[in-house]
Each structure stands twice: as structure tokens, then as C-alpha cells.
Regions:
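Conserved small-domain helix->loop->beta segment predominantly found in fold-type I
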Residues: 268-271, 277, 282, 286, ...
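Short amphipathic alpha-helical segments
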Residues: 51, 77, 216, 276, ...
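N-terminal "arm"/small-domain region of PLP-dependent enzymes with the aminotransferase-like
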Residues: 2-60, 68-69
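Conserved PLP-enzyme active-site core in the AAT-like
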Residues: 2, 11-17, 80-307
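Short hydrophobic/aromatic beta-strand micro-patches
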Residues: 221, 341-343, 403-405
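PLP-dependent enzyme catalytic core of the Aspartate aminotransferase-like
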Residues: 118, 145, 290, 356-357, ...
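Conserved N-terminal alpha-helix of the aminotransferase class I/II PLP-enzyme fold
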Residues: 38-87, 112-120
Length: 423
């Protein structure tokens, strides 16, 4: 799109050129592979000198629209959709780190990411150094000559902590390494990390982007601004790829996502299906509308809980007594999302009783659904962490995580009220 359209227009139109059939909706190209008009074109496709379809593991016209749309919504130069958020996170690390390298990460991460960093990546020879994200000096101190990336979440899961993204980006860039930000809990409608120094953004598109709890997907978006070749830190971008006639990824306009596609997606195959891409696109078209209502409902629920006599604490960065209030004001003028945590007086047992007493809320391991959701993180999403690791991640035994949906707000609050009465 030649004109610089606004967010609400981009979420409906970005990335799509009407195909020869004239279909207004994005078509589902349900095919595994694509016909070459001749041998020369086939050779060019495989050499990456002729853009176009080869095999849907590497790309598909339906997915191409999703790639471009999310990239534009994030203000990025390029994007690539994959099979899940976990795949997006994994690829973002493996794209820059090899055996003997390390990354520096905030300790307050989603349990699945924490497990990836502590259980799986070490098998590849990649170490993770966890730091307290409230102390910027720890990021600086943890970086060494083998550090390839700093990794944070724009809104921590499940503690809903905020980080000074620009300050962390400045630290990373001082050492000529990239900052990767998981922006799942914010969505590009509430926050765009690339505008505050991040180099790569990852999403579990299953959450707000898709929005309806139907489809697994992940997306990686790059700024296109980081000089991988000139940084001296990334030989995979500065040295030629012998499998593609010496192609140097660092010479490309969007090196990060091209390298994922040409190497990691080619070899490990965590590809998104055309149908899944189409389903996520349906959610993206209403992203701003849904997130506005999510935030509106969440604020009212937070107000209700903070005044309830059975509630011990509420963690939501917009609250005046939150230590993240200043960061919420700085980075999240439209709101800090609709996922937050709280504790019930009576501790873990009372909290679990509340979870079991809710009727509208579904007890399940997802967030950012149109429907309201609840979970007890210590016994589920972060159960594989020991007590010390849970504490470092901001998970307490009494913590309950809510994801506020789009139901009538009175029904949501009444459901919480009756469950609190039973807790």
C-alpha cells in the first residue's frame, strides 16, 4: 500500500493485492506446492533469485498476506508467520545464537519460554542468563562477548510487570546485539516495541491477533534497521551461505526473516498452514475493536477487585500504587491489556476454590480470547519451575491470572462476586 494508512485501515487491507479471481476476502491457497513455468524459473526460485512459491513449508500466498499485515501493524520491515508462538520464539533465538553463545533474558517470562531457555536451548549449547528486569544494571552486567541477544516481554506473563524497553534496547545496542521483545500480551494496537528500540518482535498470534481461541500461530517481525553484518557479532549474517551460492543475509533489506525462512523453516519445518493463516487474518481484521473492549472490561474488573474485602492484592500496572505506573503511562497510553493477576485472602486454597467456582470464566491455559479465562499459574503454566524459579518469575502460590473477555461487564463481575463469596 503506497499511502501510509492508519492502524485500523492496515488491519483490514495491509499485505493484500487482489488476485486474478477478484476475490475481496483473502483466498485460502490450500496447496502444498506451486508450478514452475519452466526450468529456469524453478532454478531461480531455489536459488532465492526469483521470488515466488516453491512449497508451502517455505511460504504460501495466504500466509504472505499475514506476514506483511502483522509486520506493517508492528511498524516493521518484514515478517514471517510460523506454526506457533513457541516456534516464533525458538526461531528468533536460533537465528542468531549457536553452540557456545548465550542470551540475556528477563526472569519474568511465560513458563513455556522459561522451559525453552532452561531445558531445550542448553541441548543446543545455548545458555540463558536470567536477570531481574526491574534492575537495568543486571542486563548490562550479564552481557559478555558471547551474548547474541537480549530477550524480554513487553508485558510480563503472568506477573504483568513492565520493562523500560527503550533503556534495555540502548543497553543491547551499546554491545552491538539485538533486543527481541515478545509483544503477545500487548498486541501492536497497544504497544509497538520497534518504535522504542527493539529489533525483533515475536508473537503468539494465537492470542490477541487471532483472538478467538481457535488457531495456533506465531509471528516474527523485524525492524530492518539493525546492521547484523557490521556489528561483528553475527557470522551467520556476514558470511556467505554456501547452500545459496554464497548469499550474505546481512546484505538484504530484511535479513532476519529471510534467514529464518531460508534456513530454519526449510530445515525444521514449523510452518503455518494456509487455513491457520486465514483464520488469524480474520482475527486481525477486528483487532483494535476487540482490544479496546478487552481493556475497557479489564479496567472495570480491576476496580471491582481492588475494592473487594476478600481480595488481598491486585497486580495491574495502571493502578496508582503499582511500581509500573510510570512505565504504563509512558508506553501504554491506550491501556496495558486485559490479562492481570490477583490474590485472594486465604492463600492458595481459597484461590483454587475461587477458580473452581467461576461459571463464565473457563479454566484453561490460554489468554486473550474473546471469552474470559482463568488459571492458577503455580500449579499449571509454571508448574515445571521449582519454588525458587517461580519466585524469580513473579509467580506466587496464591496468584490467580485472569484474561478478561468481551462478555457483558456486569455478567463478568457478578460471576467473580459469586465465586469470591465461596472462596
Amino acid at each position: 500500500m503506497s499511502k501510509q494508512y492508519r492502524f485500523e485501515t492496515l488491519q483490514l487491507h495491509a499485505g493484500q493485492t487482489v488476485d486474478p479471481t477478484g476475490a475481496r476476502a483473502v483466498p485460502i491457497y490450500q496447496t502444498t506446492s506451486f508450478v514452475f513455468k519452466d526450468a529456469e524459473e524453478a532454478a531461480g526460485r531455489f536459488a532465492l533469485t526469483n521470488p515466488g512459491g516453491i512449497y508451502s513449508r517455505l511460504g504460501n500466498p495466504t500466509t504472505d498476506v499475514l506476514d506483511a499485515r502483522v509486520a506493517q501493524l508492528e511498524g516493521g520491515a518484514g515478517g514471517i508467520a510460523v506454526a506457533s508462538g513457541s516456534a516464533a520464539i525458538t526461531y528468533s533465538i536460533l537465528n542468531v545464537a549457536n553452540a557456545g553463545d548465550n542470551i540475556v533474558a528477563a526472569s519474568t517470562l511465560y513458563g513455556g519460554t522459561y522451559n525453552l531457555f532452561t531445558a531445550t536451548l542448553p541441548r543446543f549449547g545455548i545458555e540463558t542468563k536470567f536477570v531481574n528486569p526491574d534492575n537495568l544494571e543486571e542486563f548490562e552486567a550479564a552481557i559478555d562477548e558471547n551474548t547474541k541477544a537480549v530477550y524480554i516481554e513487553s508485558i510480563g506473563n503472568p506477573g504483568i510487570n513492565l520493562i523500560d524497553v527503550q533503556a534495555v534496547a540502548d543497553i543491547a545496542h551499546k554491545h552491538n546485539i539485538i533486543l527481541i521483545v515478545d509483544n503477545t500480551f500487548a498486541s501492536p494496537y497497544l504497544f509497538r516495541p520497534l518504535e522504542h528500540g527493539a529489533d525483533v518482535v515475536v508473537h503468539s498470534a494465537t492470542k490477541y491477533l487471532g483472538g478467538h481461541g481457535t488457531t495456533l500461530a506465531g509471528v516474527v517481525v523485524e525492524s530492518g534497521k539493525f546492521d547484523y553484518k557490521g556489528s561483528g557479532k553475527y557470522p551467520g549474517f556476514s558470511e556467505g551461505d554456501e547452500h545459496y551460492n554464497g548469499l550474505v543475509y546481512g546484505d538484504l533489506p530484511i535479513p532476519f526473516t529471510v534467514k529464518i525462512r531460508a534456513q530454519l523453516l526449510r530445515d525444521t519445518g514449523a510452518c503455518i498452514t494456509p487455513l491457520a493463516s486465514w483464520q488469524i487474518l480474520q482475527g486481525v481484521e477486528t483487532l483494535s475493536l476487540r482490544v479496546e473492549r478487552h481493556v475497557e472490561n479489564a479496567r472495570k474488573v480491576v476496580d471491582f477487585l481492588t475494592k473487594h474485602p476478600k481480595v488481598a492484592w491486585v497486580s495491574y500496572p495502571e493502578l496508582e500504587d503499582s511500581k509500573y505506573k510510570a512505565l504504563a503511562d509512558k508506553y501504554f497510553p491506550k491501556g496495558v491489556g486485559a490479562v492481570f493477576t490477583f490474590g485472594v485472602k486465604g492463600g492458595k486454597e481459597a484461590g483454587i476454590k475461587l477458580v473452581d467456582s467461576l461459571e463464565i470464566f473457563s479454566n484453561l491455559a490460554n489468554v486473550a480470547d474473546a471469552k474470559s479465562l482463568v488459571i492458577h499459574p503455580a500449579s499449571t503454566t509454571h508448574a515445571q519451575l521449582n519454588e525458587e524459579q517461580q519466585k524469580s518469575a513473579g509467580v506466587t502460590p496464591d496468584m490467580i491470572r485472569l484474561s478478561i473477555g468481551l462478555e457483558n461487564i456486569d455478567d463478568i463481575i457478578e460471576d467473580l462476586a459469586q465465586a469470591l463469596d465461596k472462596a
